[in-house]
């Protein structure tokens, strides 16, 4: 058993405390049982214990809940070591650690006392009041669209809490609240995904949320609300703006997540986050925020070809499944995609295993089917780099998953749900069909183009028209290349040397009689007959006399 010392010199052991203080019970933190406990000392809470109740008979092992099982010692040792190194690096935390040893009751807070010479006066621009932009009825209508379209996939809000916040906000319309950026983000996304003409104040709602969020980045009181609002902004920008804007927003989200300590499990939060950690929310909400933020930042970074934000000391557990949303399915898909990190040196078998895991996912929401398809197309691009010879079975599976995504994209377009992959999957799928360049893959080009044109009719935007023109030009280039190849083959058959006419006639007859052609010499083939070119390319044809240098193999 490993022994560690806490900030006050106590010896910590891997034993569960026999009692917990009221503060740790209320905030669902692991208490070490000391009076005062280490958690309350760090965050300067009042530490009180209730009198010991009469001891009850010990419950059997079979009745213990899974959540009460001891954490893996190796995992805890790794997290502890990481936190100790981070706290040792931190000059802002050291005065607190020193004070804890000298006087635990009067230790200074974790704060950048000598961070610089002091802040300058900064004028505070007033924000646009949310209640001046839209009415309560409009807010409730937009929130209903948000809960119907966005919430099932990215469930970072509690619907009941959201409705209560709306009522409270319009009950006191003159007073701004820290929840306002969330309400602005919900309203903007509700407008975007409503399926109707956008709300006339959608742009103003987006701008208002942006102004408030950019202020909170430099404020001293960063809250979990701000991380939620940054996630909503990232989703909005991923749906409507350029890759750089959504990537920057997703990176800012991750930095806010770190500032509030949401990347660490509440039981293992580090001292270095004590000045900004938000301990006012339940553990499950915190876990959902961290994982959704990580999914968005990682996938946007992969698709954009940029670096993702990697946080140190991550100990946040995945959230539990919940009725009414599919966020845990999204996270499961992300955990498969972690193998595609550019720093991973995957073997061909690793990528094929990842494809099998993607195939086994059973998804019921079209937005998730789009992500599943996108993941399969990404695996294909990695396979092209890993190997020049991809099996036909793998190609068939890639095409099937791509076609599933194409059908989901059409359904979402008909439903007027502008998920970003509605445009991306048809475009990328067509590119990959052309790259595979087999008769099977090319047979899907026509239906895929028709689907892309139908989506463009639903969303007649300049971006989609440009994408459609681009893919049509690539199809024409592929067609022109094949026509040039066909012309070369046709011309080669029409060029004859008069001196070799008689010899050619004899050779032709010999080829008709050759055993490797079997009975196909005089066979009239239908126009759509598909030669197995691999048979020809792998067959040893004696172009030279068998007696001269043993012949050559043509490839």
UniProtKB/Swiss-Prot annotation:
Compartments where found: Nucleus
Keyword Hydrolase in record: no
DNA-binding region per UniProt: 21-47
Protein's organism: Aspergillus oryzae (strain ATCC 42149 / RIB 40) (Yellow koji mold)
UniProt xrefs under InterPro entries: Metabolite_Synth_Reg, Transcription_factor_dom_fun, Zn2-C6_fun-type_DNA-bd_sf, Zn2Cys6_DnaBD
Name of the protein: Transcription factor kojR
Signal peptide boundaries: none
Pfam families hit by this protein: Fungal_trans, Zn_clus
Any GO molecular function: DNA-binding transcription factor activity, RNA polymerase II-specific
Gene3D superfamilies linked to this entry: Zn(2)-C6 fungal-type DNA-binding domain
Major subcellular location class: nucleus
Record's keyword terms, sorted: DNA-binding, Metal-binding, Nucleus, Transcription, Transcription regulation, Zinc
């Amino acid at each position: 058993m490993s022994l560690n010392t806490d900030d006050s010199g106590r010896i910590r052991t891997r034993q569960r405390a026999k009692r917990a203080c009221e503060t740790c019970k209320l905030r669902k933190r692991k208490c070490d049982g000391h009076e005062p406990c280490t958690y309350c000392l760090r965050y300067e809470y009042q530490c009180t214990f209730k009198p010991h109740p009469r001891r009850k008979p010990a419950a059997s092992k079979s009745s213990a809940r899974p959540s009460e099982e001891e954490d893996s010692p190796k995992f805890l040792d790794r997290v502890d070591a990481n936190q100790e190194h981070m706290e040792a690096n931190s000059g802002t935390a050291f005065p607190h650690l020193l004070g804890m040893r000298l006087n635990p009751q009067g230790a200074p807070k974790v704060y950048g006392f000598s961070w610089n010479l002091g802040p300058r006066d900064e004028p505070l621009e007033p924000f646009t009041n949310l209640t001046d932009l839209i009415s309560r009825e409009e807010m409730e209508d937009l929130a209903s669209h948000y809960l119907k379209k966005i919430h099932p996939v990215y469930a970072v809000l509690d619907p009941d809490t959201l409705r209560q916040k709306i009522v409270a906000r319009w009950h006191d319309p003159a007073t701004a609240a820290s929840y306002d950026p969330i309400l602005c983000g919900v309203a903007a996304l509700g407008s975007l995904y409503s399926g109707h003409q956008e709300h006339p104040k959608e742009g103003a709602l987006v701008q208002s949320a942006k102004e408030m969020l950019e202020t909170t980045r430099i404020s001293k009181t960063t809250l979990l609300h701000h991380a939620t609002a940054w996630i909503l902004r990232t989703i909005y920008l991923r749906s409507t703006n350029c890759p750089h804007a959504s990537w920057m927003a997703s990176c800012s989200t991750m930095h806010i997540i770190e500032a509030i300590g949401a990347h660490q499990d509440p039981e293992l939060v580090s001292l270095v986050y004590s000045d900004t950690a938000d301990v006012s929310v339940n553990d499950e909400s915190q876990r959902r925020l961290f994982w959704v933020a990580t999914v968005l930042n990682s996938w946007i970074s992969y698709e954009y070809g940029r670096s993702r934000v990697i946080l140190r000391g991550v100990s946040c557990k995945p959230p539990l499944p919940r009725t009414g949303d599919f966020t845990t399915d999204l996270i499961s898909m992300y955990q498969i995609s972690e193998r595609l990190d550019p720093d991973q040196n995957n073997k061909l078998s690793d990528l094929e295993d990842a494809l099998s895991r993607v195939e086994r996912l059973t998804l019921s929401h079209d937005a998730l089917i789009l992500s599943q398809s996108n993941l399969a197309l990404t695996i294909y691009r990695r396979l092209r780099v890993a190997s020049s010879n991809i099996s036909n079975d793998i190609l068939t599976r890639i095409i099937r998953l791509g076609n599933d995504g194409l059908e989901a994209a059409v359904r979402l377009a008909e439903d007027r749900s502008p998920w970003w992959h509605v445009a991306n999957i048809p475009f990328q799928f067509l590119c990959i069909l052309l790259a595979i360049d087999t008769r099977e893959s090319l047979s899907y080009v026509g239906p895929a183009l028709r689907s892309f044109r139908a989506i463009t009719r639903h969303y007649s935007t300049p971006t989609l028209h440009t994408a459609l023109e681009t893919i049509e030009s690539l199809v024409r280039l592929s067609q022109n290349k094949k026509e040039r190849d066909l012309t070369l083959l046709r011309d080669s058959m029409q060029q004859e040397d008069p001196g070799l006419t008689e010899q050619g006639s004899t050779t032709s007859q010999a080829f008709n009689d050759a055993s490797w052609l079997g009975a196909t010499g005089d066979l009239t083939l239908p126009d759509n007959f598909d030669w197995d070119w691999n048979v020809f390319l792998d067959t040893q044809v004696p172009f030279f006399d068998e007696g001269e240098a043993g012949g050559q193999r043509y490839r």
